[in-house]
Amino acid sequence: MGLNLLPIEMDDIRKRLDREPNEIEWRVIDAVWSEHCSYKSSKIFLKSFSIDSPNVIMGIKDWQDAGAVDIGDGWAIVIKVESHNHPSAIDPFNGAATGVGGIIRDIISKGAKPIALMDMIRVGNLKIRKNVWLLKNIIAGIAAYGNSIGVPVVGGELSFDDTYNDNPLVDVAAIGIVRKDKIKPSIVDKAGLKLVLAGLTGIDGLGGASFASRKLSGEDEIGAVQIADPFAGKIILDVTLEIADKVEAIKDLGGGGLAVAVTEMANGLGAIVDIEKIPLRVKNMNPADVIISETQERMLYAVEEKNVEEVCKAFEEYEYPCSVIGEITSEPIIKFRYFGKDLVSLPTNALLEPPKFLWPIKNVRKNVEEKNVDLPLESTIYTVLSHPDLVSKEWVYSQFDYEVNTSTVVKPGDANGAVVSLPNGKLLAIKADGNPDLCSEDAYECGKGIVAEAYRNLATVGARGMVAVDHLQFGDPKKPEVYYTFVEAIRGIGEATRFFNIPIVGGKVSFYNENSQGKPIKPTPLIVMAGLVQGKLLKNRVEDSSYVVLLGYTRKELGGSLLSKIFKVPSQAPKVRLQEDLLSSEVVIDAINEEKITFAKDISRGGLAASLFNIIVHGYGVEISTKSILSDTDNVVENLFSESSGRFVILTNEPEWIVEKSRSKGIVASIIGKVNKKTSILTIDNTDYDLKTIVNNYFNFLEEVIGNG
């Protein structure tokens, strides 16, 4: 049957049913109990994320399709992150496009209007032509769907590593807006509701949930990839928002198709579905395939009988299929029948409660012997600053319509965080962060670090983080070293979110990100954080003769850094000191509101050198004295490329104010240099380094490699 269930799971369900499931029931169980849908290897740990916060309307403990947070004035934002990693490795265009479609439907399932998308893409070495092809088509897929459906892509991440040569990661996050008294659940609480399905069911995406719950085999898996139809998606979006007041619950048909959607929506009650009433894209489909098909652009609604006609009439105006396919029952049994014959009859609770797994762990935290870095400064600067991770992503953003709906306040790439306007007049900042290199060194510190980095990034535009979602992407959880990094990353994320009092209201776990030889990707947890601008918004600008202030203390912590990755420098991973991140962020927000700074950049990938380079690409030069850097090392390379957390580069005309404000908060700050008009020149301790070639690479790299690829 090609099932992905373990023998112990098959024995478990036999005991619960006291019989052997039939072949179709096995396929339903395989989908509902898949790692992708059930979180059977992770759910016990995810519960540690729950934070009771008065502004959380719908959080992780509610286990719904998206989280919702009160933002005041009767409004709420809805936030979700998802991925389409496996499909994008096989069919990058449709894999990425359907990822966008799926996340949008998760948002509208809450009755919310999507207002922003973010894409976080990780691919392999661009010297390999396949990776160029993958990236080009991933970007095209995201653009095709987002642009067609009218939701702006306002920011994201793009990075490169050999670990993703066979396993690209394609994450998409979405934000929606809704009146908080209009939020819709994805589950029901009473029987008698009619199940209404919008959309045609086809043979694409068969076994997609199971496909996403195992490693890529290298065999022909194209049938598990769904096909995107953004114009149908636009109809689903518009009509769902139109009829939201007429339905009791809304559920996107994603992984596992109707098998999962019906089971989860029933929420411990039961359901009867008549397969012959389901509108089909392909004639004479196998009933079992109909149940688990993951055809896109479909939604399931639980509707009072009196409202069914009005709901379907709204779809009929667009000539979009809509049909009553069943109903919610009080008997806790999920039934799929075909012309009156039961093909599936399984207890709801048995489906919703798969066996939970705690796999063995093996400590893989590295003990590294520190050595002094002995690298030539000039070539090190050129090599690190030329890395693809640090180049402009303008070519990517130019493929997206990021100004549709006119809610985008900060153009992608112009700041550390995206900013969109809300109906209540407030500004919402959004940022995504991950750090797989650090996670490879110390997953616990990485978990803390990505939360802290997202928090700092929001501070650079004047916002304070208030809510987050996470996406945890790892290899096979049954491998002790993989499961260890997963558990440690969760421990770090949980500690940091509790420290900042930021509730995680949802997320996703993606295991089995491995190639056909079983080699896992680097552990890649991701945080998407949102927060309201606290007063004034900072749009970075560079002015001649501005002072360069380094906020925070620099440490010889090069493990997991870009320098360490390129030059194989042995060093300890940075210890994330959350108090320093919090206090330095507060200084930045205060300085923005007092209009004391014109530019703020958190120090992360590439260290201080990369942050200074971010000033230079605005058409200026920068001169600094490394003797002014407050640090535990006098090694210039270590000071320039350390990725210690809790630090910012600030441009100001009142440097003493910044230093004094920092001192009052209990953190350090130092005036390390000035901006000048020596275009593309970085001056370090009175020595000039001409970065014209690096600046040219910064602006043109992606277009030359991908646009002409």
Swiss-Prot record:
Recorded superkingdom: Archaea
GO molecular function: ATP binding; magnesium ion binding; phosphoribosylformylglycinamidine synthase activity
Any one GO cellular component localisation term in the record: cytoplasm
SUPFAM superfamilies per record: PurM C-terminal domain-like, PurM N-terminal domain-like
Keywords for the protein's UniProt record, in alphabetical order: ATP-binding, Cytoplasm, Ligase, Magnesium, Metal-binding, Nucleotide-binding, Purine biosynthesis
UniProt binding sites for substrate: S83, H84, N85, H86, R105, Q226, E294, T295, Q296, S510
GO biological process: 'de novo' IMP biosynthetic process
EC number of this enzyme: 6.3.5.3
InterPro entries per the UniProt record, alphabetical: PRibForGlyAmidine_synth_PurL, PurL_linker, PurM-like_C_dom, PurM-like_C_sf, PurM-like_N, PurM-like_N_sf
Pathway: Purine metabolism; IMP biosynthesis via de novo pathway; 5-amino-1-(5-phospho-D-ribosyl)imidazole from N(2)-formyl-N(1)-(5-phospho-D-ribosyl)glycinamide: step 1/2
Annotated binding of Mg(2+) 2, by residue: D106, D252
Active-site positions on this chain: H36, H84
Predominant location category: cytoplasm
Binding residues annotated for Mg(2+) 1, in chain numbering: E82
Enzyme class: ligase
The keyword Zinc appears for this protein: no
Residues binding ATP: Y39, K80, D470, G507
Oligomeric and partner information: Monomer. Part of the FGAM synthase complex composed of 1 PurL, 1 PurQ and 2 PurS subunits.
Family label: Belongs to the FGAMS family.
HAMAP family assigned: PurL_2
Its biological purpose: Part of the phosphoribosylformylglycinamidine synthase complex involved in the purines biosynthetic pathway. Catalyzes the ATP-dependent conversion of formylglycinamide ribonucleotide (FGAR) and glutamine to yield formylglycinamidine ribonucleotide (FGAM) and glutamate. The FGAM synthase complex is composed of three subunits. PurQ produces an ammonia molecule by converting glutamine to glutamate. PurL transfers the ammonia molecule to FGAR to form FGAM in an ATP-dependent manner.
Protein name: Phosphoribosylformylglycinamidine synthase subunit PurL
Gene coding for it: purL
